[in-house]
């Protein structure tokens, strides 16, 4: 009764007003799973290919009708009669059908939407929650945890139109006793930050991920206004709330130098590693994502040696959720954590493999959204079902971000104490 009988793809809109792919998968039992692919702004060069039409007469060339046609044609035909409960078989059929290293034939957006929709349909057919089904696929049945959220409350870089070079300034409610309490703490700091910015006469417009995007003089000023907001909200920096950065350094890496144009500064890799280390000395920053360019592996070695024993160093563009690249990083002792994004690799099976490889090597795994999102909240179930321990899904604003937080609240309530919230223990920071 869990055999696939119909697969339907369609073009829908994401949170930035761009088209994306959605898929419905119908089973013999009558159950239907639906999922949508997200899309990134700052993307790693080695990510799986997001197939766009390139027809400038539609959506400025960003249409996804070709990817949708691949779902309604070749993918639907190949998956007809396949058991949805066997996720690996389903994904492998699509990978073989595509036959390329980066999924350029069918599109990672097409394959991913179907892959996740299959998982949702399978969970429904079994009468269980999606996080339970994911745990079964991950061989971690019953071993749940609620993730520590990294809340992106101040945006710069590619996520905002301002002069702040670091892309994301995040808070982590490490002192909370539950996800529900952590979410409340984050929301209170978010509202306190709005008041701090208003008092300074700064913009309270928000960026792609719901964080504020004011024009500030420097990256350090961004940290200063967050510290003020945390204290105004009645919390203590370091014990209640810690900080995390996403530098997205590939976006300001030019000709071997790290160019902070907002501050008029230029650094070598070693100098920028020192710059980050100094920030960590002055502020309770316990996680830094993409601190250096994705291709600057020599620089990453320096950064890891300098900070890796006390700060979580997360590879996003560096590893692109790819086990082959992650293994190379592990072998070379580069970074100590991986950001997990479904659409960087393009299927649920490959995503679970990356999480498993990281865990086996002692690397943490941070489940993540993209800047272009939809109401799809699958990453919430992924975080709980794999007990990854951390999630990054934007600010406490915009329904495309809050949808994931609300799903986590529901899951925590459903599990009623069976999924512990471990706070700072989840962070690979010495």
Swiss-Prot record:
Principal location: cytoplasm
Enzyme class: lyase
Gene3D superfamilies with a match to the protein in the record: Enolase-like C-terminal domain, Enolase-like, N-terminal domain
Bridged cysteine pairs (disulfide): none
Keywords: Cytoplasm, Glycolysis, Lyase, Magnesium, Metal-binding, Secreted
Location in or out of the cell: Cytoplasm; Secreted; Cell surface
Gene Ontology cellular-component annotations: cell surface; extracellular region; phosphopyruvate hydratase complex
Pathway(s) it belongs to: Carbohydrate degradation; glycolysis; pyruvate from D-glyceraldehyde 3-phosphate: step 4/5
Keyword Cytoplasm listed: yes
Cofactor descriptive note: Binds a second Mg(2+) ion via substrate during catalysis.
Cofactor(s) this protein requires: Mg(2+)
Reactions catalysed, as given in the entry: (2R)-2-phosphoglycerate = phosphoenolpyruvate + H2O
GO molecular function: magnesium ion binding; phosphopyruvate hydratase activity
Active site: 209 (proton donor), 341 (proton acceptor)
Superkingdom in the source lineage: Bacteria
Binding, Mg(2+): 246, 289, 316
Enzyme Commission identifier(s): 4.2.1.11
Alphabetized SMART domains for the sequence: Enolase_C, Enolase_N
Subunit structure: Component of the RNA degradosome, a multiprotein complex involved in RNA processing and mRNA degradation.
Family: Belongs to the enolase family.
UniProt xrefs under NCBIfam families: eno
Protein name per Swiss-Prot or TrEMBL: Enolase
Organism name: Idiomarina loihiensis (strain ATCC BAA-735 / DSM 15497 / L2-TR)
